[in-house]
């Protein structure tokens, strides 16, 4: 599988603009095949999403790498992830030296992923079962926030929990089938938004989502 990871980095990520050395190293290290269903492990390093059950998916490797790069995170930063899912994105961020707080709303996925992350000894990851659109207020502020599900707007609680300066990366769109990948920068109390292309994520469900 190590060769598959190396091939993924070399053929799928680097030619498409992933240049952050920490991101590339993490993507080449995290065992993605352990985060997918056993029957789908042969496809783990192919560049497309895969189902993980309960109507949820693990994002394709390029999107995971792209969003991680857009965070512009430095080791030791605190990152809030909304939508734990398979746990793969959280593992990549932890491998980059970040302290990850991740929230999942589906109990079955939360329990399975929490146990997997513990088994793999990702001690920098804290998991929580809750409405992700509410964030993790008692542990705020966060240097970086990443959302791995698409909602109609940027959740206000997440903006409030983003440090200043800080960066948030999330999919936003009025359509439940397609969104724009948005980068929000908070600086001196102001928000600066930029769009980074079309994406398609599962729904962000909660008080400040669908």
Curated annotation (Swiss-Prot):
Source organism superkingdom: Bacteria
Keyword annotations: Cytoplasm, Methyltransferase, S-adenosyl-L-methionine, Transferase
Subcellular location: Cytoplasm
Active site, UniProt feature: 59
The keyword S-adenosyl-L-methionine is assigned to this record: yes
Entry's EC annotation: 2.1.1.77
Catalytic activity: [protein]-L-isoaspartate + S-adenosyl-L-methionine = [protein]-L-isoaspartate alpha-methyl ester + S-adenosyl-L-homocysteine
Any Pfam family: PCMT
GO biological process: methylation; protein modification process; protein repair
GO cellular component terms listed in the entry, alphabetical order: cytoplasm
Record GO terms (molecular function): protein-L-isoaspartate (D-aspartate) O-methyltransferase activity
Functional description taken from the UniProt entry: Catalyzes the methyl esterification of L-isoaspartyl residues in peptides and proteins that result from spontaneous decomposition of normal L-aspartyl and L-asparaginyl residues. It plays a role in the repair and/or degradation of damaged proteins.
Family under the similarity heading: Belongs to the methyltransferase superfamily. L-isoaspartyl/D-aspartyl protein methyltransferase family.
Protein name: Protein-L-isoaspartate O-methyltransferase
Organism this protein belongs to: Nitratidesulfovibrio vulgaris (strain ATCC 29579 / DSM 644 / CCUG 34227 / NCIMB 8303 / VKM B-1760 / Hildenborough) (Desulfovibrio vulgaris)
Lineage: Bacteria, Pseudomonadati, Thermodesulfobacteriota, Desulfovibrionia, Desulfovibrionales
